[in-house]
Amino acid sequence: MGKTPEDFERHTMRSLIFVLALSVFTCSGFPVYDYELPVTEEALNASIARINSQTWGPNLYGVVRSHVRHVDMWNSNDYRLELQLSIRETECTKASGRDPFTCGFKVGPFVPTAVCKSVVEVSSEQIVNVIVRCHQSTFSSESMSSEEMTYMLMTDPRKRGSSRSEAFSSRGRGHSNGDWRKPDYTSPGKVE
């Protein structure tokens, strides 16, 4: 008793319908949060600014990839964004004053890279707190993945006694020589 071409076609059709139905059901929900929040880009800028202000090396880090992992809504004006960033050292020095988004990435086997989780608290569309944790990896010829754990816990610069607060307004890696504004993410009436 052999299978006929009709049996094969029927089985294939059932399989395709099953896969199609499965894909429809997995994608059928309405999104809970709008991840295109106006402050999302500012949260990314504040995160990389905080990373660059806390790293010891002479060069800036730039964002290779980023995405919003989670949004916690506390009420209609207050929420927390959780971002995941892949970063890599750029060719620009910190002293250059350049926007890291305009700097080219360093290339080679010894270039520091990291994966970071950034938690950004927002109140009334203003960033009030940034906490970043990074897992840094450095590749070498002796070990293709020797890793060290680096945690950078960073909060509002005013709370840490520093007036440094940065964000990068321009985009387009390698297209600009640099000057960028540094908006203050804390509310003007808040003094601690």
Swiss-Prot record:
It is found in: Secreted. The keyword Secreted applies. SUPFAM superfamilies: Cystatin/monellin (SSF54403). Multiply phosphorylated at serine residues. It comes from the Eukaryota. Belongs to the SPP2 family. Residues 155-192 are annotated as: Disordered. PANTHER family: SECRETED PHOSPHOPROTEIN 24. The gene is SPP2. Keywords: Disulfide bond, Phosphoprotein, Secreted, Signal. Residues 1-29 form the signal peptide. The keyword Signal applies. Could coordinate an aspect of bone turnover. This is Secreted phosphoprotein 24. Its main location: secreted. It holds the Pfam family Spp-24. One of its GO terms (biological process) is bone remodeling. One of its GO terms (cellular component) is extracellular region. Disulfide bonds join 92-103, 116-134. InterPro entries: Cystatin_sf, Spp-24.
